């Protein structure tokens, strides 16, 4: 693992804590949920519990995000049926991304700080790009040159077809 920055780096002091935290998109007092309002990229695949979407902008071909069809915030808020479907579906998405080729590993991330609608990211680490292993992959994804949205969407469609 290696940071995508040259030394020396300067460690910042943490900012003052903000309590209570401001509302996120989709929470009372926050902006409307973009997923529920249809403001996100169109789904390339969906079933009764989840929808799969390509990113807008990005540097890693094969990246996709999976959202719950119902407006819930977290794993713990999923219906029992959706929670039971998540694991097998995540495995299928991972296999489909690996099937694109040139992928060393598929990372699964859920941050949840931007919006209150459950979604996870599947991010492929390029084969042989060991400096982007582990927690370094999102940092590298941020600094690598973006690929065309059409290429990202095409890869997402190929992932969907494999499901």
Residues of each region from the PLM?
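Short connector loops at helix/strand junctions that flank enzyme active sites
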Residues: 45-47, 59-62, 67, 81, ...
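C-terminal helix-cap and adjacent tail motif
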Residues: 2-18, 25, 126-163
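A short linear hydrophobic-aromatic micro-motif
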Residues: 51-53, 104-109
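Short histidine-centered catalytic/ligand-binding loop motif
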Residues: 64-87, 140-148
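Generic beta-structure capping elements
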Residues: 55, 67-69, 123-125
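Active-site microenvironments that recognize anionic phosphate/pyrophosphate groups
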Residues: 1-66
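Histidine-centered divalent-metal-coordination microenvironment in nucleic-acid enzymes
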Residues: 63, 109, 113-139
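Long, well-ordered alpha-helical scaffolding segments within enzyme catalytic domains
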Residues: 80-100
């Amino acid at each position: 693992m290696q940071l995508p920055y040259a030394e020396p780096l300067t460690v910042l002091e943490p900012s003052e804590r903000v309590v209570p935290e401001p509302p996120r998109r989709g929470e009372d007092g926050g902006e409307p949920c973009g997923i529920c309002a249809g403001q996100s990229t169109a789904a390339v695949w969906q079933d009764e519990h989840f929808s799969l979407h390509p990113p807008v902008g990005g540097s890693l071909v094969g990246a996709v995000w999976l959202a719950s069809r119902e407006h819930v915030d977290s794993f713990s808020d999923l219906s029992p049926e959706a929670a039971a479907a998540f694991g097998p579906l995540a495995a299928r998405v991972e296999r489909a991304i690996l099937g694109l080729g040139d992928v060393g590993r598929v990372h699964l991330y859920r941050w949840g700080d931007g919006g209150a609608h459950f979604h996870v990211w599947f991010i492929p680490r390029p084969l042989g790009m060991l400096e982007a292993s582990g927690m370094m992959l999102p940092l590298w994804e941020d600094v690598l040159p973006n690929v065309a949205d059409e290429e990202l969407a095409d890869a997402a469609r190929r992932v969907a077809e494999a499901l």
